[in-house]
């Protein structure tokens, strides 16, 4: 009951009363209101719509007679504070929304996450602009729809459809540069101007208004036909990209990439670039001035490479799970053509395109600049290269329902649109007249013969129609078909509504009425396809195949509408002009020559079959009054007020009838009456798209009310008269072009039982998720059966499946409720919403595969239905010429394969087992699961040098100026230890009382370096305030033993920004020979900051530094970093070393010295161990962590402790020796309890063996192989903890660049595994090295629990692969692979790592996997080609010499060249990127790869490592190499690629700005071609060094 009592409205701000509720109610004032009620608030006599809010909390202290509403909400609804309002409780059923649009930006939301977000919104209220948050996902409510009206607020029920629209999608814009671009349209605009100044300019403006941040790629494409008789007329080098078409003409397809994967605030500047390209274009694509080529002609748009272009983008979209970005969702291809949407295409390619597009849920928008024709578009004219032409067949056409098309009207056109009709319109006829003879004879209706001139229908409108989608859960498809005549008996005002039998030709359809101007689907939905209606066909019982042919042939599950005897299941059929009567016969796998006819001028008579493909995008759009999808960009110029009546339908109608009725109704025609004997075999192709819309709202289950039986018929008879179609125009679907919709989570197509039995094979398997709980390790989190069940649904959604929503009336299975609970809408109120339901069942579909997932008694049953006759999916090889974005005019020949993976082959059983195992080692991720993956690299931050370049430094080769000083290295190493601690989520104990008493404390576990500063990240926060690590304290202490003054010099010299000041550090070089130098694994660590390529063992004393000015192998990073001077004020004064030790307040400086002096290298191991255990002066032990035994320490810290506390231990190698002996004596052991024989220096956990575990020690005799004991424990330990070895590199005691050394440094034994000279780690040099290489794998794996902060209620885990070794001169790789993670939660974790890295002096950035992969590879991108930068060697060669390194051994030439190139890369700030060659990578090409310290750019040396003959060597070196092929092995230089993963989210001062990479490219290229003689200067400096050091 509604009350008229008024209350005062007060407003509150968010967070009022400790809650974020939008509505606060006093239960004393409103005794009848309870939690969960929906309350309607409105000012008396107010024209604005009332506000609906849900009561989530009651507050008794609110003043009398008031109700309090959140301020932001009152502003949206224009409610006035302190005014009177009515407050009424409303029934949720009356205010339930049909469709909610959520828009979001800069996030990746997987489909599984969307579904879980949708479920969290059920039983709540929504209002426009409302912010929605779930598990870190943020979205905002856009449009809300009830039936065909937009509303301001409403209630979300289980049946409400939620559509997600993304304002940061991946958008490919293809501009077809066919010959029409140079023509004028009828208004005098050049089509090119119309496209660029008109459409693109408008699009970019709309993006800006909507605040979009799409990642955009713009490509100009065209096809050039050559006047040639044979391939021999073309230059040999270009023949690869010349193709021959079905008519024997030679052609070449061109793609010029204008921008690639870019995000910009302002896109209009791009228009200028496109205009410049327009002027050069004829020359680029060999239409003019093409020497050596036959005469070329640009193709028309109809003969162009339209399908090929969109397939290139699909090759990228297919791989959306690779290089997964966390700040965009959605994929869209937009093709701008100067034509009218008619294309001549290859049949196989068309079918393949359709399969790929529909299955992958990609939106394709076709924007035509031409005049809208009077026939259906888009229209494909098919040519069959594969099947010999059959002389009986005419032309073959197809109207693709899956392409969303728009016609763009330029501003000048609008002025000319003042008059419309070209012929007189028919007057209205009475209903009785119309149905005489069972045929509508009004104007324009075709007669029986199909030769009558086609009626001119507006095809766009039809498109609209086609995409008229029905409401939410229309599964009435399951209904048994009742023929329409049964309805007629209910009550008919006029002649019967649809009879076909009386005349072969169904009335053609007129203007799709209101849909035309109706509201629209924007999005990349598959399209508003055009009017494809019915074709006259005498065989009434023949069920014909859909217009879009392709692979929805009648083999797709058929509707129940036709009784089985009449069903003719056929292979994909085709419509040919002239074969109207032909039946389709089944020949699985082959095509039949007889095909149905399609007449593009009267598509309304074309048969249309309902299939799951056609329904894939239906739930994206609101539904019109008669159930059709509403798409705003189809507008009609006629007033359709008559259609606005409210029509509801009888929920019992079968979908077929509804379709049919709606079809006619929408067409504004009445059909003839049906004879009683007729079976309902109506050719009813209601074009599903057309009208499936038609299914009524009521049947959707949203509002099951009593239906008015007459309403349907009435509306039919009063609908407007046929109206020639040209009065309707298709505009531009701006909504889909600005905020593309993601593929809907639900669909309503369900196959009938008969179809499932006849056409499908059924397979099922059961899983008992909770059965194996006992054998899992105790700590492993366990998923309940309900959680596993939901995860199964999520996984299917993630792979593109859709949940089939069925109407409430009929259940597919009598015992189990249909998806989303069959209970009456509101019986599960607010409270029960999250109650896990013991039983559940979901049906899901994708293409022609269906899954039924059932949970009963903790057992999950998965039933899969696969088609008995799968389609053969073609693989099409395509060759084209590509000009990448960084190149002005050079086209490269590329090839790719277009293919579509068969859905039937996905290993669901394996995936389901993987989910059940929740990350345990029984199942690991395999490539065929298409798991999501992102690769990250940890790079040493070089803020100073980067900043200098950003601020305008002319040259970029300022990174390798000075070698890193020791403290910097130590600092970095220490930072790395803190970073890995962060990965391991280890917190050091007693942080609060371990503050160092000096300027600022170091943060975290400082492992190295006089605590000079946060040396490498000036931009980062001041180095920590939280205490420090044992190592740093020890290093400090060591520093303090030297004179304070000297220390100050060093540190301050280092920290100054002027590199010149570093000279204060340079003292005379001292080379110390190490006892283990002979070839033991850890080579000597000379006390020289940078003589080794990556030796980063902290040196014992700073005063022996020998800076090496340039060492080619040390791809180090710039020193000269500004440091925070506050950090280094007083090194010498008594810093409390204690904080490094567990008991933080005992011990002082003198006792420390005492310990140090009492231990010598001759002390017994037990003595040293006792000193290590000392609570205040010993090694800092890790506090007890879950899963770590007590008394653990980190191996690198103990080695540094030994160096500082034991006399005579001066190098890491000696410290490692002592620890190695302890390990052998079993005084210490690896923390997993594993009896390793090797002590590994790095971030490895070891524990002190306590007396209380002698049995354990006895078990692990040294004689036992190191890998046997406790293998399971060990494996699970390794899956939980990150452990990284620190690589010791070979030292070169010399200032001479490596490439000029008389003998080259030894290289890793297996080149492929190491990829570069940088890591000279374990070469095959000694037994110790071999053992270590066995113990320390290249790559290790950890299973991470992602959701540390419990943001979600599911188990979230991912596999993390990381490098087993860390070297300061190489990037450290971390790869994440996942299936069961909420992307936002994972992103939150990685962002935490990113911040941690910054505070540790590093930079963590997402990078491309396989940046140099060829277009045809798994990681390749068909529109990306690497840029080659040649190295000008000719300027360095001496007169008469053939090779740069002629004075050395010939077999070292290549290695020297390689080292020389590395030295140049090092100067520019590149470090090595040892990408892991794992099972997931493309064929392991062992080409050395580098990444810039800013993470913005990759370099690759374009040749693999191998020995060459002298002749080859000479050729290689000549810059004018014979073969200039892109990927050839012949040129000396570098391949260059941008890291497109580095978006704004990840940028900081350490990555430089967006222009940084281009500046670097320009300067690097200048250096390599020897501009301003820079290359020669560099070379001569190197030679001088060599001569200077010669005796």
Swiss-Prot record:
It comes from Mus musculus (Mouse). Phosphorylation at Ser-992 and Ser-1518 by AKT1 and PIM1 inhibit the activity of DEPDC5, releasing inhibition of the mTORC1 pathway. Ubiquitinated. Amino acid-induced 'Lys-48'-linked polyubiquitination of DEPDC5 by the BCR(KLHL22) ubiquitin ligase complex leads to DEPDC5 proteasomal degradation and inhibition of the GATOR1 complex. Ubiquitination may occur at multiple lysines. The modification Phosphoserine is found at residues 505, 992, 1518. It is found in: Lysosome membrane; Cytoplasm, Cytosol; Cytoplasm, Perinuclear region. InterPro entries: DEP_dom, DEPDC5_CTD, IML1, IML1_double_psi_beta_barrel, IML1_N, WH-like_DNA-bd_sf, WH_DNA-bd_sf. Residues 1175-1250 form the DEP domain. Residues 427-455, 478-532, 695-720, 1040-1064, 1118-1153 are annotated as: Disordered. It holds the Pfam family DEPDC5_CTD. One of its GO terms (biological process) is negative regulation of TORC1 signaling. One of its GO terms (molecular function) is protein-containing complex binding. Disulfide bonds: none annotated. Keywords: Cytoplasm, GTPase activation, Lysosome, Membrane, Phosphoprotein, Ubl conjugation. This is GATOR1 complex protein DEPDC5. Residues 430-439 have a biased composition (Basic and acidic residues). As a component of the GATOR1 complex functions as an inhibitor of the amino acid-sensing branch of the mTORC1 pathway. In response to amino acid depletion, the GATOR1 complex has GTPase activating protein (GAP) activity and strongly increases GTP hydrolysis by RagA/RRAGA (or RagB/RRAGB) within heterodimeric Rag complexes, thereby turning them into their inactive GDP-bound form, releasing mTORC1 from lysosomal surface and inhibiting mTORC1 signaling. Gene3D superfamilies: Winged helix-like DNA-binding domain superfamily/Winged helix DNA-binding domain (1.10.10.10). Belongs to the IML1 family. Expressed at low levels in all brain regions. Expressed throughout brain development, including in midgestation embryonic head (11.5 dpc), neonatal brain and whole adult brain. Present in neurons and absent in non-neuronal cells, including astrocytes (at protein level). The lineage of its organism: Eukaryota, Metazoa, Chordata, Craniata, Vertebrata.
């Amino acid at each position: 009951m509604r009350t008229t009592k008024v209350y005062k409205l007060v407003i509150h701000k968010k967070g009022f009363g400790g809650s974020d509720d939008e509505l606060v109610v006093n239960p004393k004032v409103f005794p009848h209101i309870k939690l969960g009620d929906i309350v309607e608030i409105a000012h008396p006599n107010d024209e604005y719509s009332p506000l609906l809010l849900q009561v989530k909390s009651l507050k008794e202290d609110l003043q009398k007679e008031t109700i309090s509403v959140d301020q932001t909400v009152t502003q949206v609804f224009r409610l006035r504070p302190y005014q009177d309002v009515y407050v009424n409780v409303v029934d949720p059923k009356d205010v339930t929304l049909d469709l909610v649009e959520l828009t979001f930006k800069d996030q990746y939301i997987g489909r599984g996450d969307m579904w879980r977000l949708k479920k969290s919104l059920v039983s709540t209220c929504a209002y426009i602009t409302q912010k929605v948050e779930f598990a870190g996902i943020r979205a905002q409510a856009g449009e809300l729809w009830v039936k065909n009206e937009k509303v301001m607020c409403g209630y979300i029920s289980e049946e409400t459809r939620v559509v997600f629209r993304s304002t940061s999608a991946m958008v490919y814009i293809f501009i077809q540069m066919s010959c029409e671009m140079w023509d004028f349209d009828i208004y005098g605009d050049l089509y090119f101007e119309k496209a660029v100044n008109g459409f693109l300019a408008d699009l970019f403006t709309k993006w800006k208004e909507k605040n979009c941040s799409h990642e955009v790629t713009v490509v100009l494409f065209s096809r050039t036909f050559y006047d040639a008789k044979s391939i021999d007329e073309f230059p040999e080098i270009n023949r690869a990209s010349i193709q021959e078409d079905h008519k024997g003409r030679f052609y070449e397809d061109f793609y010029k990439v204008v921008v690639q994967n870019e995000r910009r605030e302002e896109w209009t500047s791009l228009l200028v670039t496109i205009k410049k390209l327009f002027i050069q274009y004829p020359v680029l694509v060999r239409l003019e001035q093409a020497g050596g080529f036959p005469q070329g002609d640009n193709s028309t748009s109809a003969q162009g490479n339209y399908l090929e272009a969109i397939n290139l983008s699909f090759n990228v979209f297919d791989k959306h799970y690779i290089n997964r970005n966390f700040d965009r969702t959605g994929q869209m291809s937009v093709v701008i053509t100067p034509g009218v949407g008619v294309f001549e295409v290859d049949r196989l390619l068309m079918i393949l395109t359709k399969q790929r597009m529909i299955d992958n849920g990609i939106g394709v928008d076709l924007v035509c600049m031409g005049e809208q024709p009077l026939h259906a578009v888009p229209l494909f004219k098919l040519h069959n290269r594969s099947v010999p032409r059959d002389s009986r067949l005419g032309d073959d056409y197809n109207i693709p329902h899956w392409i969303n098309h728009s016609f763009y009207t330029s501003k000048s056109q609008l002025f000319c649109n003042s008059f419309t009709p070209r012929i007189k319109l028919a007057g209205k006829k009475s209903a009785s007249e119309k149905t005489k003879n069972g045929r509508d004879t009004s104007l324009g209706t075709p007669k029986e013969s199909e030769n009558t001139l086609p009626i001119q229908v507006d095809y766009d409108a039809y498109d609209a129609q086609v995409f008229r989608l029905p409401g939410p859960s229309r599964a009435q498809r399951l209904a048994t078909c009742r023929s329409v005549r049964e309805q007629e008996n209910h009550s008919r005002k006029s002649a019967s509504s649809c009879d076909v039998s009386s005349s072969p030709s169904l009335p053609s359809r007129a203007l799709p009425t209101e849909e035309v101007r109706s509201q629209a689907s924007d999005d990349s939905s598959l399209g508003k396809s055009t009017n494809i209606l019915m074709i006259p066909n005498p065989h009434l019982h023949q069920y014909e195949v859909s217009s879009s042919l392709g692979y929805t042939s009648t083999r797709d599950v058929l509707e129940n509408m036709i009784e089985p005897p009449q069903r003719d299941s056929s292979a994909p059929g085709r419509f040919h002009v002239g074969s109207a009567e032909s039946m389709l016969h089944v020949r699985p796998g082959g095509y039949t020559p007889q095909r149905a006819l399609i007449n593009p001028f009267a598509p309304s008579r074309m048969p249309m079959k309902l299939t799951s493909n056609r329904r894939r995008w239906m739930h994206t759009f609101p539904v019109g009054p008669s159930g059709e999808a509403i798409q705003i960009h189809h507008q009609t110029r006629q007033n359709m007020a008559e259609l606005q009546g409210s029509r509801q339908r009888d929920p019992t109608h079968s979908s077929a009838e509804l379709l049919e009725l709606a079809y006619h109704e929408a067409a504004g025609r009445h059909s003839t009456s049906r004879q009683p004997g007729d079976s309902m075999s109506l050719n009813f192709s209601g074009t599903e798209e057309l009208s499936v819309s038609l299914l009524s709202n009521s049947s959707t289950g949203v509002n099951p009310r009593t239906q008015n039986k007459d309403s349907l018929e009435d509306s039919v008879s009063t609908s407007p008269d046929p109206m020639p179609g040209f009065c309707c125009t298709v505009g531009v679907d701006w909504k889909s072009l600005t905020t593309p919709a993601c593929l809907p989570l639900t669909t309503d197509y369900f196959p009938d039982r008969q179809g499932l039995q006849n056409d499908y094979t059924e397979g099922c398997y059961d899983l008992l998720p909770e059965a194996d709980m006992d054998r899992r390790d105790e700590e492993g989190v366990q998923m309940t059966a309900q959680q596993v069940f939901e995860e199964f649904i999520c996984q299917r959604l993630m792979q593109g499946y859709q949940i089939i929503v069925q109407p409430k009336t009929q259940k597919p299975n009598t015992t189990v409720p249909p998806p989303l609970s069959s209970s009456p809408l509101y019986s599960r109120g607010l409270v029960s919403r999250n109650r896990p339901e013991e039983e559940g069942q979901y049906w899901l579909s994708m293409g022609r595969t269906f899954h039924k997932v059932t949970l009963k008694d903790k057992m999950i049953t998965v039933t899969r239905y696969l088609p008995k006759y799968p389609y053969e999916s073609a693989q099409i090889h395509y060759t084209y010429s590509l000009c990448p974005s960084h190149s002005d005019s050079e086209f490269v020949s590329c090839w790719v394969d277009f293919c579509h993976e068969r859905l039937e082959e996905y290993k669901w059983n394996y995936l389901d087992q993987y989910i059940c195992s929740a990350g345990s080692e029984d199942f690991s991720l395999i490539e065929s699961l298409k798991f999501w993956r992102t690769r990250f690299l940890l790079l040493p931050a070089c803020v100073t040098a980067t900043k200098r370049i950003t601020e305008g430094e002319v040259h970029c080769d300022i990174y390798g100026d000075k070698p890193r000083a020791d403290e910097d290295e130590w600092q970095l190493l220490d930072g790395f230890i803190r970073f890995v601690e962060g990965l391991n989520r280890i917190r050091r104990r007693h942080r609060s009382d371990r503050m160092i008493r000096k300027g600022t404390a170091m943060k975290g576990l400082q492992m190295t370096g006089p605590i000079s500063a946060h040396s490498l990240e000036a931009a980062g926060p001041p180095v920590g305030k939280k205490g420090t690590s044992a190592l740093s304290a020890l290093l400090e202490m060591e520093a303090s033993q030297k004179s304070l003054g000297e220390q100050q010099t060093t540190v301050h010299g280092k920290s100054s920004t002027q590199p010149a000041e570093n000279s204060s550090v340079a003292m005379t070089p001292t080379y110390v020979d190490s006892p283990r130098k002979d070839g033991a694994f850890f080579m000597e660590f000379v006390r020289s900051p940078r003589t080794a390529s990556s030796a980063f063992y902290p040196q014992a004393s700073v005063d022996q530094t020998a800076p090496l000015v340039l060492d080619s192998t040390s791809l180090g990073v710039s020193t000269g970093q500004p440091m925070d001077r506050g950090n280094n004020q007083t090194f010498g004064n008594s810093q409390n070393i204690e904080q490094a030790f567990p008991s933080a307040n005992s011990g002082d400086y003198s006792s420390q010295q005492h310990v140090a002096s009492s231990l010598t290298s001759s002390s017994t191991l037990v003595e040293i161990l006792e000193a290590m255990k000392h609570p205040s002066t010993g090694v800092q032990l890790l506090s007890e962590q879950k899963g770590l035994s007590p008394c653990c320490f980190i191996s690198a810290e103990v080695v540094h402790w030994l160096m500082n506390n034991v006399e005579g231990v001066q190098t890491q190698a000696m410290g490692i020796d002592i620890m190695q002996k302890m390990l052998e004596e079993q005084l210490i052991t690896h923390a997993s309890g594993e009896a390793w024989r090797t002590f590994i220096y790095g971030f490895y956990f070891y524990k002190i063996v306590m007396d209380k575990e002698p049995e354990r020690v006895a078990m692990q005799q040294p004689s036992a192989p190191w890998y046997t004991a406790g293998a399971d424990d060990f494996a699970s330990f390794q899956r939980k903890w990150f452990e990284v070895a620190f690589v010791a590199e070979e030292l070169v005691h010399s200032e001479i660049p490596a490439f000029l050394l008389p003998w080259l440094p030894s290289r890793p034994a297996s080149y492929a595994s190491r990829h570069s000279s940088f890591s000279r780690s374990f070469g095959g040099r000694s037994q110790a090295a071999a053992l270590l290489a066995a113990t320390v794998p290249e790559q290790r794996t950890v299973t991470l629990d992602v959701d540390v902060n419990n943001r979600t209620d599911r188990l979230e885990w991912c596999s993390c692969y990381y490098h087993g070794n860390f070297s300061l001169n190489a990037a450290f790789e971390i790869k994440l692979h996942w299936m069961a993670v909420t992307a936002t939660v994972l992103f939150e974790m990685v962002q935490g790592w990113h911040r941690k890295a910054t505070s540790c002096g590093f930079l963590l950035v997402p990078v491309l996997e396989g940046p140099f992969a060829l277009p045809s590879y798994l990681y390749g991108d068909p529109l990306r080609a690497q840029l080659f930068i040649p190295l000008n060697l000719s300027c360095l060669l001496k007169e008469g010499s053939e090779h740069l390194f002629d004075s050395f051994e010939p077999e070292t030439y290549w290695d020297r060249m390689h080292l020389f190139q590395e030295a140049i890369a090092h100067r520019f700030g590149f470090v090595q990127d040892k990408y892991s060659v794992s099972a997931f990578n493309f064929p392991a090409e062992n080409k050395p790869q580098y990444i810039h310290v800013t993470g913005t750019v990759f370099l690759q040396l374009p040749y693999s490592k191998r020995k060459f003959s002298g002749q080859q060597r000479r050729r290689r070196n000549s810059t004018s190499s014979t073969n200039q092929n892109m990927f050839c092995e012949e040129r000396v230089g570098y391949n260059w690629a941008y890291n497109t993963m580095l978006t704004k989210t990840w940028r900081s001062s350490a990555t430089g700005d967006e222009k940084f990479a281009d500046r670097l490219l320009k300067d690097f290229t200048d250096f390599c071609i020897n501009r301003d003689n820079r290359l020669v200067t560099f070379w001569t400096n190197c030679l001088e060094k060599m001569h200077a050091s010669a005796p």
